[in-house]
Amino acid sequence: GCLSLLLHYADKLPLALPVCFAGLLLMEWIYCGVRRFQGVGVELLAFFLVTIGLFVAASAVPSSLYKQFAAVLLGLAMFCVLSLILRDVELTMKLRYVIGALAVGLLVLNLFIGETRGGGKNWINLGFITIQPSEFVKVAFIFAGCATLERLMTYRNTILFVLFSGACIGPLFLMKDFGTAAIFFMGMLIIAYMRSGDWKTIAFFSGLAVAGAAVIIAFMPYVASRFATYRHAWEYAASSGYQQTRTMVAIGSGGLFGVGGGNGNLDMVAAADTDLVFGFVSEEWGLLIALCCAGCLILFALYAVRCASRARSAYFAIAACAAAGMFLFQAALNIFGSTDLLPLTGVTFPLVSNGGSSMAANFAMLAFIRAVGLENTGPPAAGKGQVPLLSLIHI
């Protein structure tokens, strides 16, 4: 991948390309060296995805490479700090209300001072940088939400969790960031079901979500147009189905091995390196590499479930499965939305799509999956109980 980019930019090689990729390689070796290459499976998968993400940035917007690499460094730092915090479940319990309040406060602040881009008011411009708060709130949502239900699925804790979830999802609806709201809702379902095992509760929440979606489609024309295009992208190839049809053409033209970095045409389509990144990777580096990216997220989920059934604390089990489930759901929305198998929602592909907020926050979320690893497995600690959903799982 890097070689194909070097060949593409042979006459006008951006300095950012060798600097950022050399820095990425050095970062990976230092991290693995400090860890003595022990138990770094999750991180190696993440490094693969991050590398593909930098390939995408280098091909689509070379000027964004420094920013994207800085986001990788920030994400790794957040991953390490969060991993240290998660070693102490009691500390996590003490921090849950503070983290939860900060998350809700950030979303409310976004409602008042946020900028509208792509139809959603989900950006805050700090002058020197623009951030997407909802990406970082995903980390806080898992941190505080899982801590709320870690000890007991009592009526009080359930009410607190539902109120917290509503306080996070509600502002996202007001911002018209429905794709991210759907990801939060999936996380809420995973957390609630893993702790209770109650299908009736899940069915009730799902029914409310369907009713809410129907209202949104009925009263928001641009959302309705996306659903009208769904499964009919070729009929609207010159209008609302343009992005989906161009993505499918790109996947077909790239074949299994791609046309080479920088040689694709999808970059001329809006959001090619973010919402349509699966097609972008497929065209330039091949469908095999794109499927490997999806496979990494599946491996995260398998790792989370395998370790969760032996976790010392229910918190580790719930948080890991929630993070992995949100990753998978987000990737499914990205892949299937851009290929007209689902309505296009405009969400990124974790760790691959171009964007600093998405990169840093998703890297931080990996800490929840890493925390359920072998050092936190064994017989359940006294008073911690088991997770109902996982009590029958043995992989």
Question: Where do the language-model regions lie?
Answer:
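Transmembrane helix boundary and interhelical junction motifs in multipass membrane proteins
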Residues: 177-182, 257-262, 272-274, 291, ...
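Generic N-terminal amphipathic/basic segments
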Residues: 1-2, 13
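Hydrophobic alpha-helical transmembrane segments of multi-pass inner membrane proteins, especially
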Residues: 10-240, 279-340, 364, 368, ...
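Glycine/serine-rich anion-binding loops at beta->alpha junctions
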Residues: 128-137, 174-176, 255, 259, ...
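Long extracytoplasmic/lumenal interhelical loops at the membrane interface
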Residues: 251-288, 308
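A juxtamembrane structural motif centered on a specific transmembrane helix
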Residues: 2-4, 334-393
